[in-house]
Swiss-Prot record:
Keywords: Host membrane, Host nucleus, Membrane, Metal-binding, Phosphoprotein, Zinc, Zinc-finger
Keyword Disulfide bond: no
Gene: NEC1
ZnF (CCCH-type) residues: 83-187
Function noted in UniProt: Plays an essential role in virion nuclear egress, the first step of virion release from infected cell. Within the host nucleus, NEC1 interacts with the newly formed capsid through the vertexes and directs it to the inner nuclear membrane by associating with NEC2. Induces the budding of the capsid at the inner nuclear membrane as well as its envelopment into the perinuclear space.
PTM section of the record: Phosphorylated at serine residues in the N-terminus. This phosphorylation regulates the localization within the inner nuclear membrane.
HAMAP family assigned: HSV_NEC1
Entry similarity comment: Belongs to the herpesviridae NEC1 protein family.
Subunit structure: Forms a heterohexameric complex with NEC2. Interacts with capsid vertex specific component 2/CVC2; this interaction directs the capsid to the host inner nuclear membrane to initiate budding.
Domain of life from the UniProt record: Viruses
Protein name, per record: Nuclear egress protein 1
């Protein structure tokens, strides 16, 4: 009976030892990971796209995480999940997973911007920077009522990035807009670009550099004549006629207007 118990103990011991020996140690695991090739990852990501997003979220710097861009740069060429950075040294698309600026940034959605457009008659002073850009040109104001995209893009940018200045103009009997970023160093969050693209069907939206400023230009190519979106343009024009434009703003408008002639 004693011998039998001893054999059982030895048998269990050998079984446990065998299982332990089969488990790869840390060095073996590391060796296994190092054997993964780029084409292996590509195969996995093709089969399981959700893994690619998890992989990009985990790694801190995928390769360099950056790609140079040329200006003028159309937002139609923007890669998903990338931010845009402009500086005197480089203009780049930066992978969102490698971005260090966007964690605390809140960006309005296209729906938020549409609600703000519908309420603009009641919020003239709140949106006065936008209306300064019209220079009390009532014909441009009338055009804006039929092109909610112009206000939406301004609203999204203005609520994401400080120190901007809009200038409205007429092109081919449609309203266009320049947004002047009053700095040569600029970071545009990925989500901001995504929301601009979401509202800009029928528009050409691109970024360029003029002197020491980055310029976002919005050009209407196809006007949607079937829109059911309406605002009280008469009331809006009346409020804007009564609104004073500060001398500092008027001087800035004239300065930028002179620089931007022929820019679009």
């Amino acid at each position: 009976m004693t011998v039998h118990k001893s054999r059982i103990r030895r048998s269990r011991s050998l079984s446990v030892t065998h299982r332990i020996q089969k488990r790869p140690d840390h060095r073996e695991k590391t060796k296994l990971y190092l054997q993964l090739k780029l084409h292996d990852l590509h195969t996995v990501f093709n089969l399981f796209p959700e893994y690619e997003q998890k992989f990009l979220a985990i790694i801190k710097l995928p390769i360099t995480g950056k790609e140079p861009i040329d200006v003028p740069f159309s937002l139609s060429n923007h890669h998903q999940h990338t931010c845009l950075e402009f500086s005197p040294y480089a203009n780049e698309q930066i992978s969102k997973s490698a971005c260090l600026h966007c964690e605390s940034v809140s960006v309005p959605t296209s729906s938020d911007a549409m609600v703000a457009h519908l309420n603009q008659v009641n919020n003239v002073m709140q949106n006065r920077l936008y209306f300064y850009g019209f220079r009390k040109d009532m014909e441009l104001i009338r055009m804006s009522a039929k092109q909610p995209t112009i206000f939406q893009i301004f609203y999204i940018v203005h609520n994401t990035i400080n120190n901007i200045f809009p200038i409205m103009f007429e092109r081919k009997q449609k309203l266009g807009m320049h947004i002047v970023f009053q700095s040569r160093t600029l970071h545009i969050p990925c989500e901001c670009i995504k929301q601009i693209v979401a509202v800009s069907s029928g528009y050409n939206v691109y970024l360029d550099i003029l002197q020491e400023s980055v310029i976002l230009t919005v050009l209407c190519e196809t006007l949607d004549t079937n829109t059911n979106i309406h605002i009280d343009i008469g009331m809006l024009q009346k409020k804007l006629e009564e609104m004073d434009i500060p001398n500092e703003i008027s001087d800035r408008l004239e300065k930028y207007k002179g620089h931007l002639i022929g820019f679009h």
